[in-house]
């Protein structure tokens, strides 16, 4: 089972329950929180709209939650949209013209904004102006509308795909990193308390260890552990319950799922450990190159199982060891 699959409605509702609603609830990312709170407090003291903010990092690290906390600290309403939802200029115009003074506009998946939409955003972000072309042909004219002071908060998993002009218009950019294990354990403990679960310290550690250092994944595993505990009539979530659940999910002790192991095995067995290019690897896996680069690789690289070199991807000695495959002495990585 892929624990990153699209969530059913019930899980989405539970996710809303587990989402931190205050800075104290938001565990981890301490440097980001410290700098962000200073920016927000200064804007409030000046009674000005906050600078536009960009959050980037892997999925599930808390970018959306930060956007909500920004709006809460500013005492502002938050309007939510996404890059794919803003296909036409009229889509963006409808969003911008419905903003009120001080609103926070959150655009998720900002890297999927098309260039024409970005160009409309430039004057909106810089000068609070919305420039619209009215009419067609020789009768066409430019209409300029004033916008109220607002704060744009954008989130992306691929900051490199944002154009330079768009990136430069954010007053502050924050990279969210993978979480430290103690922070993930604290998040699991908090979520278990909110879900009214009786869970042992050993089970908390197991869920955290399999979470890929990502709060969203940790919470999703915890919900599946809860399901198994209820169905098996377990009195509490202990090490045995957590172990059985992870086995059923095919998630190992490092948080690797079947597709992660298959990627490493393919590099080792088909390409002698690498190096192998992304396009060739995608073809061998019958998978999308974007999935490899955006979903699988970052975590595998962060835990030292995969190396990305100018010549291509290589499985490290640690990958051989984790998969129980002898590491060839002649191949040094």
Question: How should each PLM-predicted stretch be described?
Answer:
Residues 222, 227-250, 260, 314-318:
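Conserved C-terminal helix/linker of AAA+ ATPases
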Residues 161-209, 219-220:
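Conserved AAA+ ATPase core "coupling" helix
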Residues 204-209, 216-231, 262-265, 279-280, ...:
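C-terminal helical "lid" of AAA+/P-loop NTPase domains
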Residues 200-201, 211-226, 236-238, 256-258, ...:
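The conserved phosphate-sensing helix
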Residues 41-83, 93-101, 122, 157:
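Walker A/P-loop
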Residues 70, 89, 103-133, 159-169:
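Conserved AAA+/SF3 P-loop NTPase catalytic/coupling segment centered on the Walker-B
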Residues 10-56, 93, 97, 202:
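Pre-Walker A (pre-P-loop) alpha-helix and adjacent loop at the N terminus of AAA/AAA+ ATPase modules
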Residues 267-333:
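Terminal-proximal interaction/regulatory segments of ATP-powered molecular machines
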């Amino acid at each position: 089972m892929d624990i990153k699959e699209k969530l059913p409605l019930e899980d989405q509702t539970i996710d809303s329950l587990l989402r931190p609603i205050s800075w104290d609830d938001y565990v981890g990312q301490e440097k980001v929180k410290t700098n962000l709170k200073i920016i927000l407090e200064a804007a409030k003291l000046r009674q000005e709209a906050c600078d536009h903010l960009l959050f980037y990092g892997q999925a599930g690290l808390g970018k959306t939650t930060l956007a909500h906390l920004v709006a809460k600290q500013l005492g502002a309403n938050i309007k939510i949209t996404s890059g794919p939802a803003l296909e036409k200029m009229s889509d963006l115009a409808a969003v911008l013209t419905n903003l009120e003074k001080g609103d926070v506009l959150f655009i998720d998946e900002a890297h999927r904004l098309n260039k024409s939409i970005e160009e409309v955003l430039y004057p909106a972000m810089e000068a609070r102006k919305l420039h619209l072309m009215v009419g067609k042909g020789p009768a066409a004219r430019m209409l300029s509308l004033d916008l109220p002071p607002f704060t744009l908060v954008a989130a992306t998993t691929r900051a490199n795909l944002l154009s330079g002009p768009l990136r430069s218009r954010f007053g502050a950019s924050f990279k969210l990193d993978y979480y430290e294990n103690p922070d993930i354990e604290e998040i699991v403990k908090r979520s278990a308390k909110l879900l009214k679960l009786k869970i042992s310290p050993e089970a908390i550690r197991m869920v955290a260890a399999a979470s890929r250092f990502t709060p969203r994944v940790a919470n999703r595993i915890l919900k599946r552990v809860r399901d198994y505990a209820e169905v098996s009539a377990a009195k509490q979530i202990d090490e045995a319950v957590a172990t059985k659940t992870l086995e059923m999910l095919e998630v190992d002790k490092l948080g690797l799922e079947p597709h992660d192991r298959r990627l490493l095995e393919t590099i080792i067995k088909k390409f002698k450990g690498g190096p192998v290019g992304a396009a060739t690897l995608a073809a061998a896996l019958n998978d999308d190159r974007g999935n490899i680069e955006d979903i699988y690789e970052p975590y595998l690289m962060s835990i030292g199982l995969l190396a990305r070199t100018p010549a291509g991807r290589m499985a490290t000695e640690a990958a051989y060891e984790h998969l129980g495959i002898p590491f060839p002495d002649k191949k040094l990585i």
